[in-house]
């Protein structure tokens, strides 16, 4: 069931859709994922006359509007023309999966069709519409995190995701630095590994990681490193540091769940156990509510 590939930077994993009853660790404030701060721009009017995409009416002006908007949001592999091809439909499906908080490009509403006035149209017009981008690298002492996927693994390409995930990583890094690392400067930084492929979609290395809404975190050691080949059973595993890292992520409003098998941290409410998560944690986010112009339905 698990797909494994031997590699120098750690074991990849399958993160399935496991329901989680959220428990807040003691002292951690309650969050509301629907009101999370995200990067925004003015709401955009996208006056579609009909549907665009798979099986749509695909009027030329409508197609042009949708593709220009997707390109502006970072789906830059699309061509700015009026063609509806498989790349366009896949980009629409990826956008739909993201806005529904899915970890795979599948599920209800992921049909590759933008209906005028529908949910996908509404999200395209939203000021906080998801932007697709290269994940932040970090690595500086003030960042609190290091993205080894971007900085070190030049032969790998799981470097991409949503602006929402990028914000979550950088904010968690800042929180970890000020809340823990400043008092324990010899501790490892949060070490980020895989997010998603450059155009999202399925990857042979993961069951999820398709929508830029999750990333992996390496297990820290007591020597201040996180080389990627450490498990929670290793005598050098640093539980206190991992607790601080997971706490920083859980404090972020869009974080939906964290998968990691340390039974102590599971009992404390920082994470949920799932097979395959002894050697890394898997952090998932969900989507905020769309922010649209006043008067829009």
Annotate each predicted stretch with a short phrase.
Residues 41-52, 73-74, 132-160, 221-231:
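Acidic/histidine-rich, surface-exposed loop or edge segments in extracytoplasmic proteins
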Residues 83-91, 113-121, 185-204, 261-268:
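Acidic helix-start/capping segments at beta-turn-to-alpha-helix junctions
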Residues 219, 224-297:
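Catalytic cores and adjacent binding grooves of peptidoglycan-active enzymes
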